[in-house]
Amino acid sequence: LNRRLSEISNDIQVSFEFFPPNTPEMETTLWNSIERLAPLKPSFVSVTYGAGSGTRDRTHDIIKRIQKDTALLAAPHLTCIDAGREELIQIAKDYWASGVRHIVALRGDLPNSDEKPSMYASDLVELLRSVADFDISVAAYPEGHPEAPNPQFDLLNLKRKIDAGANRAISQFFFDIESYLRFRDRCVTVGIDVEIIPGILPVTNY
C-alpha cells in the first residue's frame, strides 16, 4: 500500500476513513493506524458517524483529538437520514464553534421501511452552506450506487450535490483502478470539475 500510494501521490490525492472505536482495544488500534498512515500525507482523514448521540459524540471526540495531536486535516461524517433540519443546523453550528471546518455530507443508510427520506445529501450540502462556509465533501460511486437504476442517474445525482455547493467528492471503495479513472472521465462530461478523491478504508485487523 505504501509503495502504491507513493507512486500515485503526485497525480491522485487520497483520504482515509476511520470508525469511532467502541472499546479501549479498538481505540489503541485506531491511534496506531493514524500514526502509521500520517506519513503518507493524505488530503484528509474522515471519521464515520452513526445514529444515536453516543456514536456522534465519539466521532466528535476523535476529530478533536486528531486536530489537537496530529498535523492531519480531519473531517467528521454527517448524515441526514436520522435527524431533523433543526438538529442538523445545531450540530453544524457546534462543529463550526469547535473549529471543525470540513464535513463529509451524506444521506446515510435507509431504514427498513418504504418511506422516502425527507432529505438527501444535496439538501444537507445546502443546509451546511446556509450555516457557515464549510469545506464540504460528498460521496461518489465509481462502481455505481446500489440504489441507482443506471450509471447516468448516479452521475447526475453526484452533480446535484456538487451544484448544491460541495467542494469535492470522495469515492466509495473500489477494487478496479480503471473503473475509478473511467468514472472520473465521465464526471467531466457532465460538468463535474471538482476533485474525485479515492477513499481508502485501512484494514486494522485480519
Model-derived segments and their meaning:
Residues 80-94, 115-118:
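Glycine-rich anion/phosphate-binding loops
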Residues 53-77, 118-139, 181-200:
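Alpha-helix-loop-beta-strand connector modules within alpha/beta enzyme cores
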Residues 13-31, 74-86, 137-153:
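Active-site mouth loops of central-metabolism enzymes
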Residues 5-9, 34-41, 60-71, 92-100, ...:
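Acidic (Asp/Glu)-rich catalytic clusters
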Residues 21, 42-61, 108-117, 167-186:
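Glycine-rich, proline-tolerant flexible connector loops at the mouths of alpha/beta enzymes
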Residues 12-20, 43-47, 74-78, 103-105, ...:
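Hydrophobic faces of well-ordered beta-strands that scaffold small-molecule active sites
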Residues 1-16, 23, 67:
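N-terminal amphipathic alpha-helix/helix-capping segment at the start of soluble metabolic enzymes
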Residues 88, 132-206:
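Active-site-adjacent structural elements that line small-molecule/cofactor binding pockets in enzymes
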